[in-house]
Regions:
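Extracellular serine-dependent O-acyl
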Residues: 1-34, 53-65
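Conserved catalytic region of serine esterases and O-acyltransferases that act on ester linkages
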Residues: 33-118
Length: 118
């Protein structure tokens, strides 16, 4: 991405992939073989998508509105361990970790942040 943004007129990159990589270094990445995906390729329906949404919000809306995603009360409570539709529910306990993964991705979009303390 750095190469593409340097060679084009693209000014903003939404680092959703980086936020997922950050999340994978946290305690939320359970040893279930799914790696926070729903099918080993796509983000799981719960916490991974929540982190991606927080990244989009922080990248596009926060700079224009000054509104922060912290304190957002939305929770996705569905849980599934299906190998075709895995979903880690978003809870009051893990939502701040996903939001932190998004924050760190926006701060350092081209580097993975170690979140093992979260």
């Amino acid at each position: 991405m750095q190469k593409i943004t340097a060679q084009t007129c693209i000014d903003v990159v939404i680092p959703s992939g980086t936020s997922l990589q950050n999340l994978r270094t946290s305690s939320l990445n359970k040893d279930n073989g799914m790696d926070l995906t729903r099918d080993l390729y796509h983000m799981d329906y719960g916490i991974s998508r929540y982190a991606a949404a927080a990244t989009v919000f922080r990248t596009l809306l926060t700079p224009c509105t000054g509104i922060s995603v912290e304190g957002n009360g939305y929770r996705y409570s569905n849980s599934s361990t299906s190998t075709t539709g895995y979903s880690t529910p978003v809870t009051d306990a893990n939502a701040p970790v996903a939001i932190r993964a998004a924050l760190e991705a926006c701060r350092e979009p081209y580097a993975v942040t170690d979140m093992s303390k979260f």
